[in-house]
Amino acid sequence: SGITIVAASGRPFVMMPDSVMNIVGLDYAITSNGAVISKCGKTVHRSLILPEDVLKILGAVRNDDVILEGFIDGFTYADVRYVHRPLDYGCEPEYFEYTRSCHGKIVDMRSFLSKHRNELDLISIISTDEKLRNRLLSSIEKACNSVEITTSTDHFVEIMSAEASKAKALLRLCDFLNIGMENV
Protein backbone atom coordinates (compact mmCIF):
# COMPACT_ATOMS: atom_id res chain seq x y z
CA SER A 1 0.00 0.00 0.00
CA GLY A 2 1.37 3.38 -1.01
CA ILE A 3 4.10 1.85 -3.16
CA THR A 4 4.03 2.05 -6.95
CA ILE A 5 6.21 -0.49 -8.75
CA VAL A 6 7.55 0.54 -12.16
CA ALA A 7 9.69 -1.52 -14.56
CA ALA A 8 11.85 0.42 -17.04
CA SER A 9 13.52 -0.95 -20.15
CA GLY A 10 14.73 -0.07 -23.60
CA ARG A 11 12.66 -2.94 -24.96
CA PRO A 12 9.21 -2.45 -26.45
CA PHE A 13 6.34 -3.62 -24.25
CA VAL A 14 5.62 -6.99 -25.87
CA MET A 15 9.31 -7.93 -25.70
CA MET A 16 9.53 -7.45 -21.93
CA PRO A 17 10.56 -10.67 -20.16
CA ASP A 18 7.81 -12.56 -18.34
CA SER A 19 10.04 -12.57 -15.26
CA VAL A 20 9.64 -8.79 -15.13
CA MET A 21 6.03 -8.49 -16.25
CA ASN A 22 4.93 -11.10 -13.70
CA ILE A 23 6.35 -9.20 -10.73
CA VAL A 24 3.60 -9.16 -8.13
CA GLY A 25 2.31 -5.62 -7.74
CA LEU A 26 3.84 -4.25 -10.95
CA ASP A 27 1.83 -1.13 -11.74
CA TYR A 28 3.55 0.53 -14.69
CA ALA A 29 6.09 -0.22 -17.41
CA ILE A 30 8.31 2.38 -19.03
CA THR A 31 9.40 0.85 -22.32
CA SER A 32 11.01 1.69 -25.66
CA ASN A 33 13.72 3.70 -23.86
CA GLY A 34 11.09 5.84 -22.18
CA ALA A 35 8.95 6.56 -25.23
CA VAL A 36 6.02 4.56 -23.84
CA ILE A 37 4.37 4.40 -20.42
CA SER A 38 1.90 1.55 -19.86
CA LYS A 39 -0.36 0.52 -17.01
CA CYS A 40 -1.44 -3.13 -16.94
CA GLY A 41 -0.56 -3.47 -20.62
CA LYS A 42 -2.54 -0.40 -21.71
CA THR A 43 -0.59 2.53 -23.12
CA VAL A 44 -1.13 5.71 -21.12
CA HIS A 45 1.51 7.88 -22.84
CA ARG A 46 3.65 7.80 -25.98
CA SER A 47 6.38 10.24 -26.99
CA LEU A 48 6.59 9.78 -30.75
CA ILE A 49 9.42 10.79 -33.05
CA LEU A 50 8.24 13.73 -35.16
CA PRO A 51 7.36 12.61 -38.71
CA GLU A 52 9.72 15.19 -40.22
CA ASP A 53 12.55 13.81 -38.07
CA VAL A 54 11.81 10.29 -39.31
CA LEU A 55 12.23 11.55 -42.88
CA LYS A 56 15.50 13.31 -41.94
CA ILE A 57 16.80 10.11 -40.33
CA LEU A 58 15.90 8.14 -43.46
CA GLY A 59 17.65 10.80 -45.54
CA ALA A 60 20.78 10.47 -43.42
CA VAL A 61 20.98 6.69 -44.02
CA ARG A 62 19.74 6.65 -47.63
CA ASN A 63 23.13 5.75 -49.14
CA ASP A 64 24.34 3.43 -46.40
CA ASP A 65 23.91 -0.30 -45.96
CA VAL A 66 22.65 -0.32 -42.39
CA ILE A 67 20.08 -2.38 -40.54
CA LEU A 68 17.02 -0.48 -39.31
CA GLU A 69 14.49 -1.30 -36.62
CA GLY A 70 11.34 0.54 -35.63
CA PHE A 71 9.29 0.33 -32.44
CA ILE A 72 5.58 1.02 -32.82
CA ASP A 73 3.16 0.82 -29.90
CA GLY A 74 4.96 -1.98 -28.10
CA PHE A 75 6.11 -3.99 -31.11
CA THR A 76 9.49 -4.32 -32.85
CA TYR A 77 9.77 -4.28 -36.63
CA ALA A 78 13.20 -5.19 -37.99
CA ASP A 79 15.02 -5.64 -41.26
CA VAL A 80 14.57 -9.26 -42.27
CA ARG A 81 18.34 -9.58 -42.85
CA TYR A 82 18.95 -8.84 -39.17
CA VAL A 83 16.24 -11.19 -37.97
CA HIS A 84 17.59 -14.10 -40.02
CA ARG A 85 21.31 -13.43 -39.43
CA PRO A 86 21.66 -11.32 -36.27
CA LEU A 87 25.20 -12.47 -35.50
CA ASP A 88 26.36 -11.09 -38.87
CA TYR A 89 25.35 -7.60 -37.72
CA GLY A 90 26.97 -7.66 -34.30
CA CYS A 91 24.12 -9.09 -32.25
CA GLU A 92 25.46 -10.57 -29.04
CA PRO A 93 24.68 -14.30 -28.70
CA GLU A 94 22.60 -13.71 -25.55
CA TYR A 95 20.20 -11.51 -27.59
CA PHE A 96 19.89 -13.91 -30.53
CA GLU A 97 16.48 -15.32 -29.56
CA TYR A 98 15.18 -11.88 -28.59
CA THR A 99 16.13 -10.56 -32.03
CA ARG A 100 14.65 -13.54 -33.86
CA SER A 101 11.36 -13.18 -32.00
CA CYS A 102 10.59 -9.65 -33.20
CA HIS A 103 7.09 -9.23 -34.53
CA GLY A 104 7.70 -7.68 -37.91
CA LYS A 105 10.26 -9.05 -40.31
CA ILE A 106 10.37 -6.32 -42.96
CA VAL A 107 12.08 -6.57 -46.35
CA ASP A 108 12.14 -2.80 -47.05
CA MET A 109 12.56 -1.03 -43.71
CA ARG A 110 13.08 2.39 -45.26
CA SER A 111 9.66 2.27 -46.94
CA PHE A 112 8.10 0.78 -43.81
CA LEU A 113 9.49 3.54 -41.57
CA SER A 114 8.43 6.22 -44.04
CA LYS A 115 4.91 4.80 -44.25
CA HIS A 116 4.65 4.62 -40.43
CA ARG A 117 6.46 7.90 -39.72
CA ASN A 118 3.50 9.22 -37.69
CA GLU A 119 3.59 6.38 -35.16
CA LEU A 120 7.24 5.57 -34.36
CA ASP A 121 8.37 5.34 -30.74
CA LEU A 122 11.99 4.57 -31.60
CA ILE A 123 14.28 3.89 -34.56
CA SER A 124 17.48 1.84 -34.24
CA ILE A 125 20.34 1.96 -36.71
CA ILE A 126 22.53 -1.12 -36.51
CA SER A 127 25.99 -1.37 -38.04
CA THR A 128 29.29 -2.99 -37.13
CA ASP A 129 31.12 -0.07 -38.81
CA GLU A 130 32.04 2.36 -36.01
CA LYS A 131 33.05 5.19 -38.38
CA LEU A 132 29.73 4.89 -40.21
CA ARG A 133 27.77 4.90 -36.93
CA ASN A 134 29.63 7.98 -35.73
CA ARG A 135 29.06 9.78 -39.04
CA LEU A 136 25.36 8.95 -39.00
CA LEU A 137 25.03 9.95 -35.36
CA SER A 138 26.62 13.33 -36.09
CA SER A 139 24.51 13.86 -39.21
CA ILE A 140 21.27 13.01 -37.41
CA GLU A 141 22.13 15.20 -34.41
CA LYS A 142 22.65 18.15 -36.79
CA ALA A 143 19.53 17.48 -38.88
CA CYS A 144 17.04 16.71 -36.10
CA ASN A 145 16.35 19.13 -33.27
CA SER A 146 13.65 17.05 -31.59
CA VAL A 147 15.34 13.71 -30.99
CA GLU A 148 17.29 12.01 -28.23
CA ILE A 149 20.06 9.63 -29.34
CA THR A 150 21.55 6.87 -27.23
CA THR A 151 23.35 3.56 -27.64
CA SER A 152 22.69 0.31 -25.81
CA THR A 153 25.47 -1.73 -27.41
CA ASP A 154 28.50 -1.02 -29.57
CA HIS A 155 26.54 -1.61 -32.79
CA PHE A 156 23.33 0.31 -32.06
CA VAL A 157 22.32 3.94 -32.49
CA GLU A 158 18.87 4.40 -30.93
CA ILE A 159 16.80 7.45 -31.78
CA MET A 160 13.66 8.58 -30.00
CA SER A 161 11.71 11.77 -29.37
CA ALA A 162 13.52 14.41 -27.33
CA GLU A 163 10.61 13.98 -24.91
CA ALA A 164 11.55 10.33 -24.39
CA SER A 165 14.09 8.76 -22.10
CA LYS A 166 13.61 6.48 -19.14
CA ALA A 167 14.42 9.38 -16.80
CA LYS A 168 11.97 11.75 -18.53
CA ALA A 169 9.28 9.07 -18.55
CA LEU A 170 9.76 8.49 -14.83
CA LEU A 171 9.43 12.24 -14.21
CA ARG A 172 6.29 12.29 -16.37
CA LEU A 173 4.82 9.33 -14.48
CA CYS A 174 5.65 10.89 -11.10
CA ASP A 175 3.95 14.10 -12.19
CA PHE A 176 0.91 12.14 -13.38
CA LEU A 177 0.73 10.26 -10.07
CA ASN A 178 1.53 13.38 -8.04
CA ILE A 179 4.60 11.75 -6.51
CA GLY A 180 7.61 13.93 -5.73
CA MET A 181 10.97 12.73 -7.02
CA GLU A 182 12.25 12.70 -3.44
CA ASN A 183 9.96 9.68 -2.96
CA VAL A 184 11.41 7.72 -5.87
Q: What is the meaning of each model-derived region?
A:
Residues S1-P93:
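Active-site phosphate-binding/coordination module
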Residues A60, D64-V66, F71-V184:
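Conserved acidic, metal-coordinating active-site core of Asp-based
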